[in-house]
């Protein structure tokens, strides 16, 4: 997979690049996988986790202030920061290291209107079209910082999301990550599609 980081979210972008360059993410697990929702990783405790060990509480000892940007939303392939819940984190500050990649689902106009009514959200025509065609998780918009997106290899999300999981949505077979920063990467031209 190749992920593009957004310049509109500089704190998250810079932190992610630092952790990738430091090798922090190498050999960590995608420890929480929910089909039709997302795949989550980045827990530093997952590197040497025993089979069946509960994960998700590990962190770097700091958070990142939320960077909510209109136009950056939870479409399929979005890279977003995990965080603690509103009850202990009303500022919606992001985890210093945990992240997720959105798989999501296709949303009809009626389903999207239900989300708007229930959560008091309003989606743009572009968002509605995206959620109706490629899918995503619109109910997370404005609650978690989206700071990048998959630009190549999005099918890997589907493959990981399809693995068999046990308690706490942890894959029964470890799914490890390895990351590096690509310099001078030329994004593929998808205008022909």
What are the residue ranges of the model-derived segments?
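Cyclophilin-like peptidyl-prolyl cis-trans isomerases
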Residues: 1-193
